[in-house]
């Protein structure tokens, strides 16, 4: 008999041996910033990103209660030469908030946004049946989706974790998984693109040239300057947004663990149970493929107003408890890998697959039905904290199977080649999802701007009807040779699919040393993937924050 063990506890215990845990610096060595605004709560805090790879010691953190407090902080920072970095739930990987080594001496103040969490339904949306909701940037996605559900509304797709702030989600054009199924008509007030495409208006703290100071200003979706703010990478400070919402949908989610990867990711035209066949049938698919295993965990969502006879009804989110706790042999394998026994990666992959199959049966969660958010949210904060790379491959809808087939073949071949040399750079899953692009026409607002820096921003030079295949590869932090392996994956995707863009919140620009370090990707490849819209967006962000209050060294390097 095995005893469930928290995967977070496994990672924490193992990461200590790998040097990934850290302790606070001496608090006495960090004086309070000069003339800090009275009335704004603040304290010193240690920062770490989701995987624990980026951390900042003993940094001053402000906790504004209102948008006016953010304005006050911005003008103070401008006078004193500080940078402000908004933070929500810290469920991200890339150095968009702070860079490695940031500390008290760096003249950086983190701004905890979670008191900016008010929500109000503001009326019907532009399309019959849609609604609008005004929400603070610090509100959590789980809270927002619950608020909408109580009012009879929801979203077509959303990121799987509920512990994400609305502002953070919009800053990096966060997404779920959804394209129109065959014959499906888009519901009013919804999008198949990123959540940034749901914004009708937003309020940001920007420079007011007339007043010679920072001030809160509202931007309508039709304002050309709004294009750069819709997915701003943290280079701006949004305090509030008004979003579209659609009618509340009921979803069914069927999990399958019986389709071989060779069949699911077969060459286009092969027939059978291909990834594309499931996508055509329901429009909502996710594949989770553990390394060195033959059958992915395939989730297939479908719109289902009435409960199918075989489906178990659910009334809350997070219905896969086995994703948060694992049998002790699996926990032991993860710990031993982090302790240096990297050759156990194949055993860990097989153990994770076995735990998934057993968990789906034991919890009767292979066929679920309920309100949309209860099927869309399925990643708890207690899940295993791993490093993840991320890319969006933009292709015509007819090209999805070609993308997943080519990627699966390349990934498998390289994984085997590394293993033949005694190297095991990947010990986590591959995750594959598909979305539409950010079509501003879905807002039903005349002159609506597309999110200029969204990975899903349409490219006028590409054909209409494109979708994005999102590809992530996961591995435990600090796994040897992972940087080199991810560099090969990245180069393959950019070479094989010119429409590839990076997923801002995750790992990219790899060298053998790790992520966010390849100068060619940072300086040339990423900007080129956005075409002329890149320079226009960067210029707009610079105009709105000429004193560079809302930036960090990584963003200064990237957005230039």
PLM region spans:
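N-terminal secretory signal peptides and thylakoid transit peptides that target proteins
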Residues: 1-18
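C-terminal segment of N-terminal export signals and the immediately downstream linker at the start
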Residues: 3, 22-53
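Glycine-rich N-terminal segment of FAD-binding domains in flavoprotein oxidoreductases
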Residues: 52-157, 287
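Conserved glycine-rich FAD pyrophosphate-binding loop
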Residues: 102, 367-560
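C-terminal substrate-binding/cap subdomain adjacent to the FAD-binding core in PCMH-type
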Residues: 199-412, 416-428, 433-434
């Amino acid at each position: 008999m095995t005893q469930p063990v928290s995967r977070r506890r496994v990672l924490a215990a193992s990461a200590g041996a790998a040097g990934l845990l850290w302790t606070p610096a001496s608090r006495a060595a960090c004086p309070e910033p000069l003339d800090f605004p009275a009335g704004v709560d603040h304290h010193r805090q240690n920062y770490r990103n989701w995987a624990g790879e980026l951390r900042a010691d003993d940094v001053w953190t402000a906790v504004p209660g209102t948008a006016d407090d953010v304005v006050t902080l911005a003008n103070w920072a401008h006078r004193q030469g500080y940078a402000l970095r908004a933070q929500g739930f810290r469920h991200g990987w890339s150095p968009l908030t702070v860079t490695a080594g940031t500390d008290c001496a760096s003249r950086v103040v983190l701004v905890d946004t979670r008191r900016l969490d008010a929500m109000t339904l503001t009326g019907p949306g532009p399309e019959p049946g849609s609604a609008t909701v005004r929400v603070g940037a610090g509100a959590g996605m789980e809270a927002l989706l619950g608020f909408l559900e109580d009012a009879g509304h929801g979203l077509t797709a959303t990121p799987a974790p509920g512990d994400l702030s609305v502002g953070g989600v919009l800053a990096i054009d966060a997404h779920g998984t959804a394209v129109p199924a065959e014959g499906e008509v888009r519901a009013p007030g919804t999008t198949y693109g990123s959540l940034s495409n749901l914004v009708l208006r937003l309020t940001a703290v920007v420079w007011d040239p007339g007043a010679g100071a920072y001030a809160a200003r509202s931007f309508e979706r039709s304002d050309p300057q709004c294009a750069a703010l819709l997915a701003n990478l943290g280079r701006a400070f949004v305090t509030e947004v008004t979003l579209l919402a659609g009618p509340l949908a009921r979803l069914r989610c069927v999990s399958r663990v019986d389709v071989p990867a060779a069949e699911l990711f077969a060459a286009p035209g092969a027939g059978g149970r291909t990834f594309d066949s499931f996508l055509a049938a329901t429009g909502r698919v996710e594949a989770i493929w553990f390394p060195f295993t033959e059958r992915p965990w395939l989730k297939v969502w479908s719109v289902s107003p009435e409960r199918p006879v075989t489906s178990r009804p659910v009334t809350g989110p997070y219905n896969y408890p086995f994703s948060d706790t694992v049998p002790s042999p699996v926990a032991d394998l993860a710990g031993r890998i982090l302790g240096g026994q990297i050759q156990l990666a194949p055993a860990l992959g097989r153990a994770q697959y076995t735990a998934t199959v057993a968990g789906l049966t034991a919890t009767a969660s292979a066929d679920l039905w309920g309100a949309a958010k209860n099927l869309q949210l399925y990643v708890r904060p207690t899940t295993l904290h791993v490093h993840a790379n991320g890319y969006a491959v933009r292709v015509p809808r007819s090209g999805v199977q070609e993308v997943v087939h080519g990627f699966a073949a390349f990934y498998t071949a390289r994984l085997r080649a590394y293993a033949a040399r005694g190297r095991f750079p990947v010990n986590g899953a591959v995750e594959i999802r598909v979305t539409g692009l950010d079509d501003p026409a879905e807002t039903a607002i005349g002159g609506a701007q597309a999110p200029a820096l969204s990975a899903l921003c349409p490219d006028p030079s590409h054909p209409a009807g494109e979708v994005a295949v999102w590809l992530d590869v996961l591995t435990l932090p600090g796994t040897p040779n992972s940087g080199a392996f991810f560099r090969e994956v990245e180069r393959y995707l950019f070479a094989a699919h010119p429409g590839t863009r990076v997923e801002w919140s995750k790992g990219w620009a790899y060298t053998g040393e790790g992520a966010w370090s390849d100068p060619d990707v940072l300086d040339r490849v990423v900007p080129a993937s956005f075409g002329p819209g890149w320079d226009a967006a960067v210029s707009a962000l610079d105009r709105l924050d000429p004193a560079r209050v809302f930036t960090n060294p990584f963003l200064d390097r990237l957005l230039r």
